[in-house]
Design a protein with these regions (language model features):
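Short, acidic, metal-binding catalytic loop of nucleotide-sugar glycosyltransferases
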Residues: 25-34, 54-60
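The conserved acidic donor/metal-binding loop of glycosyltransferases
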Residues: 42, 101, 117-121
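Short aromatic/hydrophobic "clamp" motif used to bind/position activated sugar donors
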Residues: 113
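Long helical/loop segments within the catalytic core of UDP-sugar-dependent glycosyltransferases
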Residues: 65, 69-70, 77-84, 96-100, ...
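N-proximal low-complexity "stem/linker" segments adjacent to membrane-targeting elements
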Residues: 1-29
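Short beta-strand/loop segment that forms part of the nucleotide-sugar
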Residues: 34-43, 65-69
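Acidic donor-binding/catalytic loop of UDP-sugar-dependent glycosyltransferases
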Residues: 47, 120-133
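A conserved acidic beta->alpha catalytic loop
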Residues: 41-61
Length: 215
């Protein structure tokens, strides 16, 4: 696989009008530019779709989606190429997160896709790092990223301006537990090809394999 080959980053979302823009701003700061962002709105009852359309001057389009895996049908599709990162919004009938994930997989236009939660933000080199294993070995079918909770984190335009341990003891313990799990356990298990799970908050997958396995 060549470095120039693009990937799809997609986010299933439901009632996240207040937070999606932070994720988009962090995607704009990525040093890797060969990707598109796809948002699947799973029938939100708030203004999730409306805010995205207005914030990024999106236009309604017609685009056939071949549903190789089952999911609820789309209601409308919007797209913009005016921003640094191409953005597509698919609004669909509510079917739950798994159904929204299926729609995202069906709509991906590239061989690899990255799943990201709506409340995630990325470091500037995150996409470069998570795609490195598939660039070095085309047999790699899934890659997991390191996740840390954003407790007591200051964000500015989708960027972590200040990171510190929370003052709340329970929140602090959560940060320590995440670090222990991702920076110790998972890295250790990976040395023995023993990783059992890829986090849904930030994981990369090979599209044709996922469709074949019907996961």
């Amino acid at each position: 696989m060549q470095y120039q080959e693009k990937i799809t980053v997609f986010t299933p979302t439901y009632n996240r009008a207040y937070i999606l823009e932070n994720l988009y701003r962090s995607l704009q700061r990525q040093t890797c530019k060969e990707f598109e962002w796809l948002v699947v709105d799973d029938g939100s009852k708030d203004t999730t779709s409306q805010k995205l359309v207005e914030a990024f001057d999106m236009k309604a389009i017609r685009r056939p989606i071949h549903r190789k895996i089952p999911c609820q049908p789309e209601e409308f599709i919007y797209e913009t190429a005016a921003e640094k990162v191409p953005l597509t919004l698919i609004r669909k009938k509510n079917g739950g997160k798994a159904d929204a994930l299926n729609m995202g997989i069906n709509a991906c236009r590239f061989p690899y896709f990255i799943c990201m939660d709506a409340d995630s933000v990325l470091q500037a080199d995150s996409l470069i790092k998570i795609t490195a294993p598939i660039l070095s070995d085309e047999n790699t079918i899934a890659v997991g990223g390191v996740i840390r909770p954003c407790n007591d984190v200051e964000l500015e335009n989708g960027w972590v301006k200040r990171y510190r341990l929370p003052k709340n003891p329970l929140a602090c313990m959560q940060v320590i537990e995440y670090d222990r799990y991702f920076l110790a356990s998972r890295i250790l298990f990976d040395q023995f090809n023993g990783s059992l799970i890829i986090s849904g908050a930030f994981g990369l997958f090979k599209k044709d394999v996922i469709i074949t396995l019907n996961l």
